[in-house]
Amino acid sequence: MISEKEELLEWRKRAAAQPKGRVVLDLEADSLHRYQEKICLIQYADETGSCLIDPLAIEDMSPFYNWLRDTEVWMHGADYDMCLFQRAWETLPAMIWDTQTAARLLGFRQFGLAALVEHFHGVTLSKSSQKADWARRPLSPTMVTYALN
């Protein structure tokens, strides 16, 4: 888990080297547990692997949001995450490819991430930590596993 600015700077170098359109992002927030929600965890994946970024532990997230505004990303159900990005850092990705929107346009009746992953890959995703309090630290092993999957 990336929880220090120096680690974030190293991550940014690696992320900047990835081909456009080959980056996946997801966010976890604490909207079910706090009145003014905030981004509690950033899940990042590319062709070389995945990692978790802890924005609650890193005071200066500018390496992330500066990278974000020049990046094409894949997300699922990106509308809420875009609101969080805009509210937290007043920025958005350069381009967003939303798999939920694509599934709806293609006529899928079940367009949730779990349904699509099962349909295309035969893998059942756990929803065990979907409603967890992502602002609590340390994250439990179950939450970390959920976030990386």
Give the label of every model feature segment.
Residues 1-115:
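Conserved RNase H-like, two-metal-ion catalytic cores of nucleic-acid enzymes
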